[in-house]
Amino acid sequence: MSDLEQLQSQILADIASASDEAALEAVRVATLGKKGSISALLSTLGKMSPDERKSEGAKINLAKDTVTQALAARREVLKALALDARLASETIDVTLPLRESPAEAGRIHPLSQVWDEVTTIFADMGFAVAEGPDIETDDYNFTRLNFPEGHPAREMHDTFYFNPKEAAGSEAGEKPSRLLLRTHTSPVQVRTMLSQKPPIRVICPGRTYRSDSDQTHTPMFHQVEGLVIDKSSHLGHLKWILHEFCKAFFEVDNVNMRFRPSFFPFTEPSLEVDIQCRRDKNEIRFGEGEDWLEILGCGMVHPNVLKLCGLDPEVYQGFAWGMGIDRIAMLKYGIADLRQLFEGDVRWLNHYGFRPLEVPTLAGGLSS
């Protein structure tokens, strides 16, 4: 074996034994660097005769190419080994239980919890979830819901209006309709009736806005409304749905409900619903007692609303209801002040919040 072949074999052995990229770089410098062994051989070619230079130069360059390829291959192997070691050191066991410290484990906000509970209950009854924009037109928020011009709810002190110059047409060719922050989620019902053919069975949860702020009111709050439209729906169906919802939501075997006549522009007849309860100091117990507590409003969809949404009231009828998610959250979980829901106090959230990954189910208990 020639000296060049021995040198090449030794270099390849050093490359194969390099345990990391730093060691491999040291081999490269010792071999191909300015003062490396192969570089030194290349520097001797100038002293040779033309024939020797041609013969020896080809051998040395072949050895250089072989070493260069071996260095590149070993470098890729070492990179893969380094990545595997890094991944192994950073592995997280996702099967480990959550830490108990409130500072290390977050909590689900009561509003998020109740939102999930409500949608779970109505989904079990076959309702879909419909959503719409927070910024609405006067047409969808009021006119198509049978609010006449001059109705108190249209006044500035109740509704957040945008600049009068910012307006949009509800339908092509119609005159512009003023923009506002929706005061209820009922516009979603309007959009649903305009875009879908009956039968319709949806709930409409979302944020709503009114110019009001005290212990039981905030400028932004959450509502969930429901809508059923078909050819044979009646108040008996509405009563059953609300009764089943209250039993499931408050997690009681039975609940007494009281339906009182009321007035809403978009329903006729209109009703307000009270639920029987017992007040025990700072706690409210449902399904027992002699007290009554208002929880929602409802009624049969007004024929004018059906007409304004493109449905024939001689063929279709339906019912709707609405309740405040914030309010029923306060009632169920004993929250005294509505404003606390929006203050972002971590101590309050640690007390009233829920553990993550506990998804509400009817079979497993909504809030267990």
Swiss-Prot record:
Binds 2 magnesium ions per tetramer. Coiled coil: none annotated. It holds the Pfam family Phe_tRNA-synt_N. Its EC number is 6.1.1.20. The keyword Lipid biosynthesis does not apply. NCBIfam families: pheS. PROSITE patterns: AA_TRNA_LIGASE_II (PS50862). It is an enzyme of class 6 (ligase). It comes from the Bacteria. It catalyses: tRNA(Phe) + L-phenylalanine + ATP = L-phenylalanyl-tRNA(Phe) + AMP + diphosphate + H(+). Keywords: Aminoacyl-tRNA synthetase, ATP-binding, Cytoplasm, Ligase, Magnesium, Metal-binding, Nucleotide-binding, Protein biosynthesis. Mg(2+) binds at E268. Tetramer of two alpha and two beta subunits. It is found in: Cytoplasm. Its main location: cytoplasm. Belongs to the class-II aminoacyl-tRNA synthetase family. Phe-tRNA synthetase alpha subunit type 1 subfamily. This is Phenylalanine--tRNA ligase alpha subunit. One of its GO terms (cellular component) is cytoplasm.
